[in-house]
Amino acid sequence: FSDYADISTPGGTITYDSGVTEDVWGDFTIGDYKIYKVGNRIMGEIKLPNMNMANNYIMINPFKINEKYTPITTVSVNGIALREDNTSKSICGYYTSDQKVRLICSKGQKLHAVGIYFEYELKNIVQ
């Protein structure tokens, strides 16, 4: 895939539980990831437990986002993702009150604030 994500194509809208609606730009699928731009953020989603995290974490790294995004600075290991084969992997990031975990994307298992994050539903994550 390209080194640059094409986020210039309108991809619809996303509506949050709060009722707020934002435009979605782009729609790129990489493995189990869906990547898109919402507002001024690059976001993605993946359905647990269908995740091979060791591979997918690395795959997102080549995206170069030439805009300034608000970084996420709180990082800690605070959960475990269960895979279909019953193996598990530590989750880094932090939980929010809306029952999603926001993860900071980086290469490999070590995550840090690069201003790009993903939201995962918590139903398949155990602390």
Residues covered by each model-derived region:
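Extracellular/surface recognition and adhesion modules
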Residues: 35, 42-44, 65
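Terminal low-complexity, poorly structured segments
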Residues: 21-24, 34, 107, 118
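Short amphipathic beta-strand and strand-loop transition segments with alternating hydrophobic
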Residues: 30-37
